[in-house]
Amino acid sequence: MDKLLERFLHYVSLDTQSKSGVRQVPSTEGQWKLLRLLKQQLEEMGLVNITLSEKGTLMATLPANVEGDIPAIGFISHVDTSPDFSGKNVNPQIVENYRGGDIALGIGDEVLSPVMFPVLHQLLGQTLITTDGKTLLGADDKAGVAEIMTALAVLKGNPIPHGEIKVAFTPDEEVGKGAKHFDVEEFGAQWAYTVDGGGVGELEFENFNAASVNIKIVGNNVHPGTAKGVMVNALSLAARIHAEVPADEAPETTEGYEGFYHLASMKGTVDRAEMHYIIHDFDRKQFEARKRKMMEIAKKVGKGLHPDCYIELVIEDSYYNMREKVVEHPHILDIAQQAMRDCHITPEMKPIRGGTDGAQLSFMGLPCPNLFTGGYNYHGKHEFVTLEGMEKAVQVIVRIAELTGKRGQ
């Protein structure tokens, strides 16, 4: 389908891994390389109003080819890959006509197994694009990028009626900064879709409310032989804090609409320790209760410490559940579902156990649910995408554009 696979393989060859804890946006130079490449390709394709902001947001417009009061709609993907696993020297493997069983990932013992990933049983006969076991693949979200670019080429090269189509490619989505510098007014769409989901048919308009919790613990270190009544072990305090967090409310023990506390990192010495938690919950009241719980735990563990020793806790909200904003505009979901059915796909409405740029954009005035890409197992060496799933995503994007074009005629 019009260079879809070629585009995808080109995009994943560029290392665009984002980096947390960096002030600049984009956080890495590699993202600029892909953004500049996309800008050049959009220009060659003949799109208009192409802009690349100093914060790395690339926008462009495909003009309408029909007249009428047709709403401008948008499609958005992010160019960065997760900091959780290496995105350098990605070496994709193409497995045609998958026949079942384990897939060897490169040379070594790493495999992609249907025992661990049962979804493979549903993908027999399809073309799978996997890693070589040493890096992530980057389908999150370069599959989405390739699908949007291919859909633009299809719309540009065929007499398919459509209104004005806006596209945007953002940086640093994986570290939560991409949408913060997105100019909704400049973008000019009435609504949009992020193309950043998973398996074929996924349509997501609910996501976690999310917050980060950073805990700093200052203890007091002395020689262990003379420590009685003097030493305050920051690591022991950290262990006590985590022991108070409900163990059955962690990512590895929850699913569906269940929220969790996630200890993402912990480091330290006797003298000083740091902990970083992520709090997620779909329900806003439960979300606020989880934040209060963390404050109560810190207060309890820190009670009675020497004045020079303390526990400092900082909570920062990351994003909120976009459901409340998207459901105000039901036609956005109706069009996406109809487009999928027209492409012989059964829509699967499911919550995002995470977040997307669309969550932040929805609260900035741009309602923005999430479409599938055909990818699986993001952020690690077992990541893969199906070519057929990517082709389906292109078809759905094109059909959404066509259905929206008919609304104003």
UniProtKB/Swiss-Prot annotation:
Which reactions fall under this protein's catalytic activity? Release of the N-terminal residue from a tripeptide
Positions annotated to bind Zn(2+) 1:
78, 140, 196
Q: Which UniProt keywords apply?
A: Aminopeptidase, Cytoplasm, Hydrolase, Metal-binding, Metalloprotease, Protease, Zinc
Major site of localization recorded for this protein? cytoplasm
Q: Which InterPro entries match?
A: ArgE/DapE_CS, Bact_exopeptidase_dim_dom, Peptidase_M20, Peptidase_M20_dimer, Peptidase_M20B
Q: Does the keyword Cytoplasm apply?
A: yes
Where does the chain bind Zn(2+) 2?
140, 174, 379
Work out whether the entry's keyword set contains Metal-binding: yes
The record places the active site at 80, 173 (proton acceptor)
- EC assignment: 3.4.11.4
Where does the protein end up? Cytoplasm
Q: How is the cofactor bound?
A: Binds 2 Zn(2+) ions per subunit.
Q: Which SUPFAM superfamilies match?
A: Bacterial exopeptidase dimerisation domain, Zn-dependent exopeptidases
Q: Which domain of life is it from?
A: Bacteria
Any Gene Ontology biological process: peptide catabolic process
A cellular component term, taken from the record's GO annotations = cytosol
> Per the similarity annotation, which family is this?
Belongs to the peptidase M20B family.
Task of the protein = Cleaves the N-terminal amino acid of tripeptides.
Protein name in the entry: Peptidase T
Species of provenance = Salmonella typhi
